[in-house]
Structure formats: C-alpha cells, structure tokens
C-alpha cells in the first residue's frame, strides 16, 4: 500500500506534468500536436473543453454519460480574385460595361395581374409549395444529427473531419454554401413531421478578413504571397512606395529554428551564424539551409515573405484546400494548385519546377528555365 505522503507526491507530479502539457499546447494553438496517451495528432478547438451542464444521460446501456454533438459548419468561401480583377477592368473601361449591361437580359418580376385570383373579390399572391414546406415542416435528419445518441463528441473530430474533407474534395468541386438542401422527392417529404416552431437558421462562421490591400488598386488578399503575385502580374512597374510589413505585430515570432533548434547566431548543423526566415502567418522560423532553400528562394522571401508548410496556400486562389494538389516552386517556395495554373496541369512534374514569375526574373538561372 502506498502511503499518504507518497500519494500526494504522485498527485503533485501529475499536476505539474498536465500544466506543462497545457502550456505547450497553448503556445501552438494553430497547429496539431501529438498526444502521447492516445498516439494521435490532435488540434485545439472549441469542442475540446466541455462543461458539466453539457452532459446528459444516454439511452445506450454501455454509455454512462454523453455530450451533445455540434455539427461542423464550413465558412463562406471568399469571392475569387478574378472577380475583383474583372470589376477593376470594367471600371476602367466603361464602354465594355455598357455593352455587357445591354446584352444581359433583364429579369422581369411577376406582376400582380398574372398572379391575381380569377375572382374580383380579392387579389392575393399564392406562395409556392417549397415556401409552405419550409414554414410548416422541419426535417427529421437535422434533429437526428444533433441529438443522436450514437454519435459522441471527441477531441479528434475537428482534425479528422478536416483531413477527410481535404482528401475527398476534387479540383472541380467548389463548395458555395454549407446549408443542406432539403430533397423534394416523395420519400423525403413523407419523413417530414409537422411543427410550427421557428426554423433554426444556420449560423455561418465569419470568413477570414483580407488584410493585405494593394497600394495601386482596390484589390485585397488574405496572404502576402497573393498580394505579391497580384503586384507582379498586374503592375509591372515597381512601386515607389514601400511594401506592406511582412510580419504582423500581433504574431509572436519564434527566435529558434524548428529543425535544428538553433538561433540566428548559430546553426547547430553548420556551426555558423545564419539568419532565420519566419512565416508571416504563424511566426514559425527556420534556417534557409535547414529548409534546403537555394539562393533564389532566399532572395524572393526577403522581398515577398514566406509561408511555412502548415500555413501554405495557393498564391492564385488564396485557399489551402486540396493540399494534395499544391505544387511548390523551387525558386520562390510559393504554392500553386495544379488546376489554378494556366494551362492547368494534370500532375506535378517529376523534375524541378519554376513558376512563370521566377522564369521571368531569374531567366537561365531558374531551377526550371522557360523552354525557348
């Protein structure tokens, strides 16, 4: 039998170990961490912490207590940069705008005469069948998803669902809304139960703000890489004004390399001083030699910034979806979706790859020069 003093010492050590684990997790909330107890990679989310008032008894005899499951909701997709560039083009060319407006057919709404009743006593507009179903019925599967006792909340839900979503989405499939459409088949209508309660509206998460505006036009981008690509692609002349700050003051910049744990004063692999490059989205740092960067990459990231592998997004569309379709340039380390390139690529090249901007800037010194 263990003594009381020994038991208290074990509890103190356990508290210290838990506090160190939680402190390490709080420092890196944006990245998945490896849980040694379950041997899985987990990600911090609002579902991690549960209160006592969230518990409710389960109908399953093998379950003592369970928590209500919360449905995952995808944020609204941002408008593509092509729409912004098109609006800028039409603003500078009003004659083209007038021609488009002239060719576009105008949709005329129904008049009250066409929808009025045949009798002269009253004039009413009859609501459609779908509107009546939305007001009088509520779909059962929405309640089943929220209150089903067979589904249990877990710390791994957020991480695993994100990985599955990335793997299943194709390059052509684009999600425009997270609201499920109610099928209009006879079998689905028969499952609807009458209810006069107010239909609960779907709450969307606020989309990420575009905090990198262009100093020459009204275009805005979510990442500095997208802004740099926009300025190089649309504005050929070099801007006389200084570029926006590469790193936000709200980001905590790491002063040590994530690969060799060295600093700017000494690289532990080469035993020589070497400047660190930091991600402008999360603040993680690394030595260019530890990242296997060549001189071209170092030159570009000093001017345009750098994104680490976890924060990497497509420079053209600005999203990080379909990361298995991302192609990285060997001269600037920017990421491009295979289907966002012009012309689009079916698969990544077997040898080195250089984007169009690097081929123009470095010429024959690029990793993959343009074919003449």
Swiss-Prot record:
<dbReference type="GO" id="GO:0007399">
    <property type="term" value="P:nervous system development"/>
</dbReference>
<dbReference type="GO" id="GO:2000045">
    <property type="term" value="P:regulation of G1/S transition of mitotic cell cycle"/>
</dbReference>
<protein>
    <recommendedName>
        <fullName>Zinc finger protein dpff-1</fullName>
    </recommendedName>
</protein>
<feature type="compositionally biased region" description="Basic and acidic residues">
    <location>
        <begin position="132"/>
        <end position="141"/>
    </location>
</feature>
<dbReference type="InterPro" id="IPR011011">
    <property type="entry name" value="Znf_FYVE_PHD"/>
</dbReference>
<dbReference type="InterPro" id="IPR025750">
    <property type="entry name" value="DPF1-3_N"/>
</dbReference>
<dbReference type="GO" id="GO:0006915">
    <property type="term" value="P:apoptotic process"/>
</dbReference>
<dbReference type="GO" id="GO:0006338">
    <property type="term" value="P:chromatin remodeling"/>
</dbReference>
<dbReference type="InterPro" id="IPR019787">
    <property type="entry name" value="Znf_PHD-finger"/>
</dbReference>
<feature type="zinc finger region" description="PHD-type 2">
    <location>
        <begin position="316"/>
        <end position="361"/>
    </location>
</feature>
<comment type="function">
    <text>Probable transcription factor, involved in meiosis and stress protection.</text>
</comment>
<dbReference type="GO" id="GO:0030071">
    <property type="term" value="P:regulation of mitotic metaphase/anaphase transition"/>
</dbReference>
<dbReference type="GO" id="GO:0008270">
    <property type="term" value="F:zinc ion binding"/>
</dbReference>
<feature type="zinc finger region" description="C2H2-type">
    <location>
        <begin position="212"/>
        <end position="235"/>
    </location>
</feature>
<dbReference type="InterPro" id="IPR001965">
    <property type="entry name" value="Znf_PHD"/>
</dbReference>
<dbReference type="Pfam" id="PF14051">
    <property type="entry name" value="DPF1-3_N"/>
</dbReference>
<dbReference type="InterPro" id="IPR013087">
    <property type="entry name" value="Znf_C2H2_type"/>
</dbReference>
<dbReference type="GO" id="GO:0051321">
    <property type="term" value="P:meiotic cell cycle"/>
</dbReference>
<dbReference type="InterPro" id="IPR013083">
    <property type="entry name" value="Znf_RING/FYVE/PHD"/>
</dbReference>
<feature type="compositionally biased region" description="Polar residues">
    <location>
        <begin position="109"/>
        <end position="131"/>
    </location>
</feature>
<dbReference type="GO" id="GO:2000781">
    <property type="term" value="P:positive regulation of double-strand break repair"/>
</dbReference>
<keyword id="KW-0862">Zinc</keyword>
<feature type="compositionally biased region" description="Acidic residues">
    <location>
        <begin position="142"/>
        <end position="158"/>
    </location>
</feature>
<dbReference type="GO" id="GO:0005737">
    <property type="term" value="C:cytoplasm"/>
</dbReference>
<feature type="region of interest" description="Disordered">
    <location>
        <begin position="108"/>
        <end position="204"/>
    </location>
</feature>
<keyword id="KW-0805">Transcription regulation</keyword>
<dbReference type="GO" id="GO:2000819">
    <property type="term" value="P:regulation of nucleotide-excision repair"/>
</dbReference>
<keyword id="KW-0677">Repeat</keyword>
<dbReference type="GO" id="GO:0005634">
    <property type="term" value="C:nucleus"/>
</dbReference>
<dbReference type="GO" id="GO:0009408">
    <property type="term" value="P:response to heat"/>
</dbReference>
<keyword id="KW-0539">Nucleus</keyword>
<keyword id="KW-0804">Transcription</keyword>
<comment type="similarity">
    <text>Belongs to the requiem/DPF family.</text>
</comment>
<dbReference type="Pfam" id="PF00628">
    <property type="entry name" value="PHD"/>
</dbReference>
<keyword id="KW-0863">Zinc-finger</keyword>
<feature type="compositionally biased region" description="Polar residues">
    <location>
        <begin position="184"/>
        <end position="196"/>
    </location>
</feature>
<keyword id="KW-0479">Metal-binding</keyword>
<keyword id="KW-0963">Cytoplasm</keyword>
<feature type="zinc finger region" description="PHD-type 1">
    <location>
        <begin position="256"/>
        <end position="314"/>
    </location>
</feature>
<dbReference type="GO" id="GO:0071565">
    <property type="term" value="C:nBAF complex"/>
</dbReference>
């Amino acid at each position: 039998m263990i003594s009381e003093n020994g038991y208290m010492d074990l509890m103190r050590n356990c508290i210290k170990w838990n506090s160190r684990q939680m402190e390490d997790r709080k420092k890196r909330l944006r990245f998945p961490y490896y849980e040694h107890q379950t041997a899985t990679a987990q990600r911090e989310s609002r579902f991690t912490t549960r209160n006592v008032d969230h518990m409710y008894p389960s109908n399953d005899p093998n379950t003592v207590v369970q928590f209500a499951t919360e449905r995952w909701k995808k944020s609204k997709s941002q408008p593509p940069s092509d729409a912004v560039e098109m609006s800028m083009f039409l603003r500078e060319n009003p004659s083209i705008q007038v021609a488009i407006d002239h060719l576009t057919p105008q949709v005329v709404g129904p008049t009250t005469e066409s929808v009025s009743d045949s009798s002269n006593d009253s004039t009413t507009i009859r609501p459609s069948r779908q509107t009546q179903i939305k007001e009088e019925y509520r779909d059962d599967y929405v309640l089943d998803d929220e209150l089903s006792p067979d589904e249990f909340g877990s710390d791994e839900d957020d991480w695993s669902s994100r990985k599955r979503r990335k793997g299943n989405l194709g390059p052509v499939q684009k999600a425009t809304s997270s609201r499920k459409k109610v099928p209009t088949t006879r079998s689905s209508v028969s499952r609807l139960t009458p209810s006069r309660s107010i239909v609960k509206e779907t709450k969307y998460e606020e989309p990420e703000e575009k905090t990198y505006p262009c100093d020459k036009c009204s275009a805005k981008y979510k990442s500095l890489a997208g802004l740099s690509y926009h300025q190089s692609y649309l504005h050929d002349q070099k801007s006389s004004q200084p570029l926006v700050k590469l790193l936000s003051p709200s980001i905590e910049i790491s002063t040590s390399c994530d690969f060799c744990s060295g600093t700017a004063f000494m690289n532990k692999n080469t035993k020589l001083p070497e400047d660190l490059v930091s991600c402008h989205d999360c603040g993680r740092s690394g030595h260019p030699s530890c990242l296997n960067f060549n001189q071209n990459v170092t030159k570009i990231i000093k001017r345009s910034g750098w994104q680490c592998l976890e924060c990497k997004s497509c420079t053209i569309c600005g999203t990080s979806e379909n990361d298995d379709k991302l192609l990285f340039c060997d001269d600037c380390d920017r990421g491009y979706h295979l289907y966002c390139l012009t012309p689009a690529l079916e698969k990544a090249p077997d040898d080195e790859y250089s984007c169009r901007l690097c081929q123009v800037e470095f010429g024959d010194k690029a990793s993959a020069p343009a074919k003449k």
